[in-house]
Amino acid sequence: MKIIRAKNYQDMSRKAANIISAQVIMKPDCVLGLATGGTPVGTYAQLVDWYNKGDLDFSEVTTVNLDEYRGLPKEHPESYWSFMHRNLFDHVNIDPAHINLPDGTNMDAEAECKRYDEVIRSVDGVDLQLLGIGHDGHIGFNEPHDAFDLGTHCVDLTQETIEANKRFFDGNVDLVPKQAYTMGDRKSTRLNSSHRCIS
């Protein structure tokens, strides 16, 4: 593992964007595993800037997102589908058919988890996975104590996570979804990734 130190958030965002852009340039049809939350916003802004300058081409890129709230329509402003479109997808030339997120409106958890694991397998895994680490060490909606061999699964959000996320829902804890779909670390899915960028 290589540790890259950053002076501040802006520096970290640029360094993470450098890693992603190098992957896209080196393998134009790469599969990027993407994350949401406050941490990658600056990284996505840098990628959009480079795209606008003609330095990046996302036309062959496929993306697989880490997680999505269960029960939240994708058009909801706080769905991760909306987040990704607002911060990246709507600003670059990615093919909408190459964008993959868990379907938060599918209330059949077993079927949705199987479907998303199959999506990941169908693209031969992830070339580069962008991850953020939460305040308590969670990655995606995987808590630190969760089993390491899970594929995509449905989780009940901890009260701590619900409290932390209420800032996105007008400070109202009752509006925060109580469950989510999240990728796990099972080798047949995400651990195919050859590189990870954890910020």
Question: At which residue positions do the language-model features occur?
Answer:
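A glycine-rich beta-strand to alpha-helix segment
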Residues: 30, 38-43, 118-144
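Short beta-strand segments
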Residues: 33-37, 65, 102-103, 130-133, ...
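A glycine- and small-aliphatic-rich helix-loop capping segment at beta-alpha/alpha-beta transitions
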Residues: 46-57, 80-82, 144-154
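Single conserved hydrophobic/aromatic residue that forms the stacking wall/gate
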Residues: 191, 195-199
